[in-house]
A protein has these predicted regions:
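An N-terminal domain-cap segment
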Residues: 37-92
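Charged, gly/pro-rich active-site loop segments
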Residues: 40-45, 122-253
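Short connector loops at helix/strand junctions that flank enzyme active sites
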Residues: 64, 78, 90-94, 110-114, ...
Length: 253
């Protein structure tokens, strides 16, 4: 059984949409594309920052697919994992992932507890010094960001074939994301793969509630948006490669 996933958009395409398209206009919210506004939201979202267009949210979730999986039963647990989104499966889509079988959060999966998946996008400090209107320049700094919360009940995946297909789909997704290598998961001896897979607990979450918060100056005066965009392009975080080198050199032994 394969997991019906859609091709992931490029990081450049998603960032261009977030930082230019959304900041410069309003995302279309026609009746067909909307998700119902949550009656009990998990995050505070001012109207100006609320995005409900499901296709837009799904594209974001596929691009920024390394999630925080949050559960509160039987105790608060947060696990950081890659995920796969099947956008056409279920009313709002279905999230697939896995955690270590030694992780205490397995108890929440086995119990069918409710979970929240947090998808984080670009974020950064915004200085009033970047802006041009008098109102903004006399104000205080802020932090712009994009995030999607998706909630639903955890369902364990125990069937060996479904477990294998989840791993294959997940690996294919990320191999394509780095441009591909000569590694072929599906070419490995399946019995050996499944022996190793006893160390994980796969799961799925059919999304029952989805919330998009995009705080990207879309409600600000046009001159401020135009002035801020090139400054955001110069905001560079340390890359994984750079931080890994730093960690190797400075971490306590």
């Amino acid at each position: 059984m394969s997991i019906p996933v859609s091709p992931s958009p490029s990081r450049r395409d998603v960032l261009a949409t977030l930082l230019a398209g959304l900041a410069g206009s309003t995302v279309s919210l026609d009746a067909e594309a909307q998700s119902a506004e949550p009656s009990d939201p998990s995050v505070y979202i001012p109207k100006a920052h609320l995005v409900q267009d499901r296709a837009f949210l799904h594209a974001f979730m596929r691009e920024f697919s390394f999630i925080e999986l949050v559960t509160t039963s039987p105790t608060l647990r947060i696990t950081h994992i890659p995920s796969v989104l099947a956008p056409a499966q279920g009313k709002y889509g279905t999230i697939f992932g896995h955690i270590s079988a030694q992780n205490d959060q397995v108890k929440a999966i086995r119990a069918g507890a409710r979970a929240l998946a947090v998808f984080r996008g670009p974020h950064g400090y915004v200085s009033p010094g970047w802006l041009v209107t008098d109102f903004s320049r006399q104000g205080v700094p802020t932090w712009n960001f994009a995030v999607v919360h998706a909630a639903g009940r955890l369902v364990p995946i125990d069937d060996p074939e479904r477990k294998y297909e989840l791993l294959a789909t997940l690996i294919d997704q990320y191999e394509q994301g780095i441009g591909g290598t000569d590694y072929r998961f599906r070419g490995l001896p399946k019995d050996e793969v499944m022996k190793r897979a006893t160390g994980i607990q796969p799961f799925e979450i059919e999304i029952e509630q989805i919330e998009g918060k995009f705080k990207l100056f879309q409600e600000r005066p046009e001159p401020d948006k135009v002035a801020a965009l090139p400054k955001l392009d110069t905001y560079r975080e340390r890359s994984l490669e750079a931080y890994t080198r730093h960690f190797y050199a400075t971490a306590p032994k």
